[in-house]
Regions:
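N-terminal secretory signal peptides
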Residues: 1-10, 14, 18-28
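Detector for C-terminal structural segments
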Residues: 379-426, 478, 482-492, 518-675
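Alpha-helical secondary-structure segments
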Residues: 139, 143-149, 209-215, 261, ...
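Gly/Pro-rich hinge or "lid" segments in bacterial periplasmic/extracellular proteins
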Residues: 187-201, 205-210, 215-294, 655-675
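N-terminal lobe/hinge region of extracytoplasmic solute-binding protein
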Residues: 63-117, 257
Length: 675
């Protein structure tokens, strides 16, 4: 999956409602004020919130999101972006959730089991789950039928437009055939219902109102991780009929139905979202929730710091300049409160656009020729020193952010306990290299010297009419000075690593939507974007870049290599050969279903081929420093799925947590994982 005051009698909620964030910061600097009483011994309802320090927990909490990560779809069955899931995970539950250690735990399913060869999985459902509307009024009872309706919606090309079909079509008997059937039927498929799906032989049945049985194509011992994804979430046929297909597909917080821990109290686009407890939440007695959770959209980290200082945010991530301001003054009150967060479960990469357009819609032939050249791409992976850029995200330990792989660390382990990316490292030849805080691992073999590659690329490209320097167009949101600062450092990294005679970064801006203003018209040379796993297997990462697959997200929506494949130019022959070879390697690995170790070894070879040919160039892991009133280690920490922003069972404190406390949290977490 593919990021976002108070004075006198003005409450935090009413202030944020009445003013934009930028205006709010100005008002705060003029009048200040103290935070309203927001603490208490318990959260909104149900269980006590975790409390390992004896602190006074918060009843209300104000978090933040980057302004460029505003929600675009409220429909979890339709959306494929993490920025959407981060919101809707609080509103819409599926079969399972996760705990703070990343372990699968019951949600609507109370238990599940597989047969001996893991081809048949049975899920047992709760009998006390209801759909409610935006006012918290009960609309319908949830049964196994709602999960049948949900899967039919996902697999129906006319309804869900091919979104989120990869998991069910890869794993469920008959799912791919049913999807193709609906695709061939065109608009007529809109009339199909879940019974039509069952009659077509799709491997899902509901023997009673509270039992679901999935039949997999092949043995799949990790299918429970697959079933945790949003492709398998419930939907109400009553609501679909009431709204109609197009309106349900584009539903929003006012007309959707809820079954998660919260409902939306208020949504101001580009400003705030506030959630209050779902009064009919099935698990209310067993989880702690906030009386109000507010998410404020932040366009600038400097503003975020000011809001935090005024207690109009309860947590912020710190950029390089703010950390420098704090650490350069030994008397700064925040020195003892700097908290290094654990890595977010995602991996960021530079996704090249192989079919770039100019602003007037004509092809950018110079870039398209350059990026099709293998030596040109290899300069990015083997020569681009990003240490200074990493400092923008982690000033104190920048190289902790280095990402050398396409698949994120921690996704899965083989039967010998080897973490998957260590297998990729072995294929790449740097498995013996360790973090040293000084040099990027992938630059150590040649010291970052790409002079021979650069010479080769320039000679080969000059011969086909490419002019230098090649302009690499990179877009940032216009309203963010932090994004501009980050891009300025990245531009200097390009200059220092490539030389201004070879590749120059051209920083451009968009107003509000990267998708609508940049990706859809194909204006970018590359986008740096993160992927969080949907389930616990490498195919979920590597399958997003393959050819000949409608579900390969990046191939269709970022690199546009799927479009190139329709009519490649002569200069793109080698590029297409590389993608075909990569696709064959991925498909061969995915065909290994009875030997986990052999499967992962084969995927590692495919990933190494991708990296050697730099079809994508990995960039960083998100390991930030923060100031916070929440214990990060109490939050959901799933390696896959979209549940990590679900605000249940958070440990919070009226007083900010300290560096020492966070170090203790980290040690306790590591001990629990290892024990």
């Amino acid at each position: 999956m593919n990021i976002d005051f108070e004075s006198r009698n003005i409450t935090r909620r009413s202030f944020l409602k009445g003013a934009g964030v930028v205006g709010a910061a100005g008002l705060l600097s003029a009048c200040g004020g103290s935070k309203s009483n927001n603490s208490g011994s318990t959260a909104a309802s149900g269980a006590q919130a975790p409390n390992s320090t004896g602190a006074t927990p918060l009843k209300e909490y104000i978090s933040w999101e980057s302004a460029n990560r505003e929600i675009e779809s409220w429909n979890l069955l339709y959306s494929q972006t993490l920025s959407d899931a981060n919101v809707v995970t609080n509103l819409w539950d599926g079969l399972m959730s996760f705990d703070c250690y990343g372990k699968l735990v019951p949600a609507i399913a109370t238990s599940w089991e597989a047969n001996e060869d893991s081809t048949v999985w049975t899920f047992h459902l709760r009998d006390d789950v209801d759909w409610v509307d935006c006012n918290g009024e009960v609309k319908e009872h949830i049964t196994a039928t709602d999960f049948l309706v949900g899967l039919e919606w996902v697999l129906n090309a006319s309804k869900n437009e091919a979104n989120n079909t990869s998991m069910p079509t890869l794993y469920i008997v008959g799912a791919e055939e049913y999807y193709e059937k609906t695709k061939d039927m065109g608009a007529a498929a809109a009339d199909l219902r879940y019974q039509d799906m069952l009659d077509a032989g799709v491997g899902l049945e509901a023997p009673d109102d509270y039992t679901l049985v999935f039949t997999c194509k092949d043995p799949c011992p990790y299918f429970d991780t697959v079933a945790s994804y949003t492709s398998f979430y419930p939907a109400s046929q009553v609501l679909i009929d009431e709204l109609g297909i197009e309106t349900f597909r584009g539903c929003d917080n006012t007309n959707m139905w809820y079954c998660g821990p919260y409902i939306v109290e208020e949504y101001i686009q580009g400003n705030t979202k506030s959630y209050i407890p779902n009064p009919h939440y099935y698990d209310a007695a067993n989880v702690s929730r906030f009386e109000r959770l507010t998410v404020t959209m932040i366009s600038d980290q400097a503003i975020a710091f000011q809001l935090y200082q005024n207690r109009e945010l309860d947590e912020i991530d710190l950029n390089e300049s703010t950390i420098t301001t704090i650490t350069s003054d030994p008397n700064n009150e925040y020195n003892s409160q700097l908290c290094e967060k654990r890595a977010r479960p995602s991996a960021y990469a530079m996704h090249f656009n192989y079919q770039k357009n100019n602003a007037d819609g004509t092809p950018d032939v110079n870039w398209n020729k350059a990026i099709a050249n293998t030596a040109f791409r290899q300069c990015f992976y083997r020569g681009l020193n990003l240490k200074a850029w990493f400092s923008r995200y982690n000033k104190i330990n920048p190289l902790k952010c280095e990402n050398d792989y396409y698949t994120m660390k921690g996704l899965c382990y083989n039967t010998q306990g080897a973490e998957y990316t260590t297998l990729v490292a072995k294929e790449m030849g740097f498995d013996a290299e360790k973090y040293d805080g000084e040099t990027m691992i992938r630059l150590r073999a040649n010291g970052g010297d790409i002079s021979a590659l650069k010479k080769q690329a320039m000679e080969e490209l000059s011969a086909i009419g490419v002019t230098f320097p090649v302009k690499a167009t990179y877009f940032i949101i216009a309203s963010s000075t932090s994004a501009l600062d980050n891009a300025t450092i990245l531009k200097q990294c390009f200059s220092d690593s490539f030389g201004d005679d070879f590749i120059k970064l051209d920083v451009q801006t968009y107003v509000s939507s990267l998708t609508q203003e940049v990706r859809t018209p194909q204006l970018q040379s590359f986008v740096i974007n993160g992927w969080s796993a949907d389930f616990g297997d490498p195919i979920n990462f590597l399958g997003q870049e393959t050819l000949h697959d409608d579900n390969a997200f990046y191939s269709h929506y970022y690199s546009n290599i799927a479009r190139v494949a329709e009519a490649p130019a002569d200069y793109q022959k080698d590029l297409m050969d590389a993608f075909e070879q990569y696709t064959d390697l991925v498909n061969a690995a995915n065909a290994i279903v009875n030997d986990t170790d052999a499967r992962y070894e084969a995927f590692a070879k495919a990933e190494a081929y991708m990296l050697e040919n730099v079809l994508v160039s990995p960039t960083y892991y998100d390991i930030a420093w923060s100031l916070t009133h929440a214990n990060e280690y109490s939050k959901i920490n799933a390696m896959y799925g979209g549940c990590n922003y679900k605000a249940v069972n958070w440990e919070t404190s009226e007083e900010a947590y300290t560096t020492v406390q966070y170090e203790q949290f980290a040690k306790a977490f590591d001990a629990a994982i290892q024990g």
